Amino acid sequence: AVCVSLLGAANIPPHPLNLINFMEMIRYTIPCEKTWGEYADYGCYCGAGGSGRPIDALDRCCYVHDNCYGDAEKKHKCNPKTQSYSYKLTKRTIICYGAAGTCARIVCDCDRTAALCFGDSEYIERHKNIDTARFCQ
């Protein structure tokens, strides 16, 4: 089956949106049959919180994203969950706009890296909704 992303085809111009940006980036990079929500409770790190060791490559994407947000908060005094930024989805990649070192660019780069990582990583069904108390120590 061929999946055509209308977002990519339309070449939507840059726009600031906050957390919705990250969801849109994820939708752009993941397989067509998946929804961004399927990544919200996956492994030890995809979703709220996180502990233990990532259980696979996809979970490692979330682990790296969590740490990226943590660095943005601690080192740069940014608020990643509410930070607006501008980006463009084009030609199967994501372009972040803004000056390097600004909160907008830092957060966009965190989200971009994670979304592209999601697109490159295998989604293993049995790692969704796992017992984190048992598997994430």
From Swiss-Prot:
Binds 1 Ca(2+) ion. Its cofactor is Ca(2+). Ca(2+) binds at Y45, G47, G49, D66. SUPFAM superfamilies: Phospholipase A2, PLA2. Keywords: Calcium, Disulfide bond, Hydrolase, Lipid degradation, Lipid metabolism, Metal-binding, Neurotoxin, Presynaptic neurotoxin, Secreted, Signal, Toxin. Expressed by the venom gland. CDD domains: PLA2c (cd00125). GO terms for cellular component: extracellular region. Residues 10-17 form a propeptide. It is an enzyme of class 3 (hydrolase). Gene3D superfamilies: Phospholipase A2 domain. Disulfide bonds join C44-C136, C46-C62, C61-C117, C68-C110, C78-C103, C96-C108. Residues 1-9 form the signal peptide. InterPro entries: PLipase_A2, PLipase_A2_Asp_AS, PLipase_A2_dom, PLipase_A2_dom_sf, PLipase_A2_His_AS. The active site is at H65, D111. One of its GO terms (biological process) is lipid catabolic process. GO terms for molecular function: calcium ion binding; calcium-dependent phospholipase A2 activity; phospholipid binding; toxin activity. Heterodimer; disulfide-linked. The A chain has phospholipase A2 activity and the B chain shows homology with the basic protease inhibitors. Belongs to the phospholipase A2 family. Group I subfamily. D49 sub-subfamily. This is Basic phospholipase A2 beta-bungarotoxin A1 chain. It comes from Bungarus candidus (Malayan krait).
